Regions:
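Positively charged n-region of N-terminal signal peptides that target proteins for export
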Residues: 1-8
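Bacterial N-terminal signal peptides
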Residues: 9-18
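Sec-dependent signal peptide cleavage junction
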Residues: 18-29
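ATP/NTP phosphate-donor binding region
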Residues: 28-108, 289, 306, 330
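Accessory alpha-helical/coil subdomains and C-terminal extensions
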Residues: 34, 40, 64-65, 70-75, ...
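Short Gly/Thr/Asp-enriched flexible loops that form oxyanion-binding sites at enzyme active sites
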Residues: 120-142, 283-292
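Internal gly/pro-rich beta-alpha loop/helix module
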Residues: 146-218
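ATP/nucleoside-binding phosphotransfer catalytic cores, i.e., glycine-rich phosphate-binding loops
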Residues: 281, 285-354
């Protein structure tokens, strides 16, 4: 009997030790990342201030990077943070010069072994464009994550603090290494190439069409299920170091009775054109005649959100298909292509691979 009691007591003590170990392992916050996350602030709604409780009529880009971080003290438990105020603007005022500054800053700071990743706070209107530009121009496998918000900081139930927290979690996660530039929004992780803003008001304003998100964040834990397959970051051939501007590319949108003379005007004032055609990149006969006469690179995209434009289905012989890129992302790739060889053969290759 005595041996039996001793055995039971020993078993109970062992179970208590196991239970205690499990609590310490799973019940405590994740260990703080040993590296540093650089938060690059550019403004946008996430830094917006307006009438208390309201979601409209606010001033974007009013709060600083330090203000945003101070509102989420839990971020300090994730990693050491360095804040950099790149600019403080509405994202509709983002320029190629700001893009180049972001790329230069990331490429320079990524060489610091203490830096583990980057978060860019940004307005949602043009977030997808900045993300794709950086996806093609930053030269690091370290995570680069964009985030923002649909509600200003002064609104009821502002979404910015959680989005910023989750973006830092992703930037500090090994799961995000080598995945290219990402967007983190409303618990979801999106690849830069496929992410797009799809709502003017919904806090779940980002989506990725037919491909969907590549992962999620849950209570600070990062789950990445897909790896982007198109060329990006360290494998990209584009080098923007030393550039202070980019070639000019205009986007034209075809519709019923759209004036074809707009094509001539745009061509005279641009280095290249992207045309958002109807359906699978189609136009009226009047547009086709003028497009065929243009002597600058022309990329054909679509007004449609999903689907692919292929070179064997183009109506104009001197154009190149955008594949699955939206008009605005096709314009970014064309602008970068125009910094080098912009032959039709090279453009076809780029739009298939990037």
């Amino acid at each position: 009997m005595k041996k039996h009691v001793i055995f039971l007591l020993s078993l109970l003590m062992a179970l208590c030790c196991i239970f205690s170990a499990a609590i310490s392992e799973n019940g405590e916050p994740a260990a703080r990342h040993p590296g540093k996350i650089v938060v690059l602030a550019t403004g946008g709604t996430i830094a917006g201030v307006g009438e208390a409780g309201k979601t409209t009529g606010y001033k974007p880009g009013a709060l600083t990077a330090e203000d945003l971080l101070a509102a989420v003290p839990e971020i300090a438990d994730v990693a050491e943070i360095e804040a950099v105020q790149v600019c403080n603007v509405n994202s509709d005022d983002i320029t190629a010069e700001i893009w180049l500054t972001l790329a230069e800053t990331i490429n320079r700071m990524a060489g610091d072994p203490e830096v583990a990743g980057f978060v860019i706070t940004h307005g949602t209107d043009t977030m997808e464009e900045t993300a794709y530009f950086l996806n093609l121009t930053v030269k690091t496998d370290k995570p680069v994550v964009l985030t923002g918000s649909m509600r200003p900081a002064t609104s009821l139930s502002a979404d910015g603090p959680m989005n910023l927290y989750e973006a830092v979690c992703v930037a500090a996660s090994e799961e995000a290494v080598g995945k290219g530039v990402l967007i983190v929004f409303a618990d979801r992780i999106y690849a830069a190439r496929t992410a797009a803003k799809t709502s003017t008001y919904n806090i779940m304003a980002l989506a990725a069409g037919e491909t969907g998100s590549i992962g999620m964040v849950r209570d600070g834990t990062v789950y990445v299920y897909e790896t982007p397959s198109r060329i990006h970051t360290t494998a990209s051939e584009f080098d923007v170091s030393g550039l202070t501007s980019l070639p000019k590319v205009s986007i034209l949108y075809f519709s019923v009775d759209a004036d074809p003379e707009l094509l001539r005007y745009a061509a005279e004032h641009s280095d290249g054109l992207v045309i958002a055609g109807a359906g699978a990149g189609e136009f009226s006969e009047k547009w086709i005649d003028i497009i065929n006469s243009l002597e600058i690179p022309v990329i054909i995209s679509s007004r449609i959100n999903d689907g692919v434009i292929t070179n064997d289905n183009l109506l104009c012989g001197n154009t190149v298909a955008a594949n699955t890129l939206s008009p605005q992302k096709a314009a970014i790739l064309l602008r970068l292509a125009l910094t080098g060889d912009a032959s039709r053969e090279r453009l076809e290759k780029l739009f298939l691979e990037y």
